[in-house]
Amino acid sequence: GSGKTTQLPKIAMMVGRGQKGLIGHTQPRRIAATSIAKRISEEMDAEVGQVAGYKIRFKDELEPGATIKLMTDGILLAETQRDRLLKAYDTIIIDEAHERSLNIDFLLGYLREILPKRPDLKLIITSATIDSERFAKHFESVNKKPVPSINVSGRLYPVQIRYRPVQDEEENDDRTLMQAIADACDELMGAGSGDILVFLPGEREIREA
């Protein structure tokens, strides 16, 4: 990717955001919010929660002096009930907006309505696939001002697809799956140095592998 998820909050800090409120950064899933907070903290040579922390359901890793707050979009949506103008934030980053969940759609609609009341609030919407011009026009209609749109190219790597021989359906049980993974890894390890990324259908299969 382009690095937008981990670099944008740090860039926002560099240009002076996060001084009058938190830099809020939403993710569709809890595991993404926690792992990104850890990654940003690592890059900034700090403990999780000191500069960048996270808040998810039942867990809050954010110290009083922190600047960047990772959270699920559901957490930010819940905060609108007690902080209707989101005054705790001076910058909000809505990441992965293309997922178009109910929470994200509600948030985008809500933020559009409060922006005229919060001219100091900066809203950043990021995605790998959304129609940026359409989103820009949607928010331009609020303040009657041009909304900047930035396209950043990601990195593409060559991919070679190879298939292992098809197995008999009668043999297609969990042990066969594990054996197929082991065989594929053996073949790849014999082809030279590199990393192996395995996709499996469920959590149980991942843990067993």
Where are the regions a protein language model picked out?
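P-loop NTPase motor module signature
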Residues: 1-209
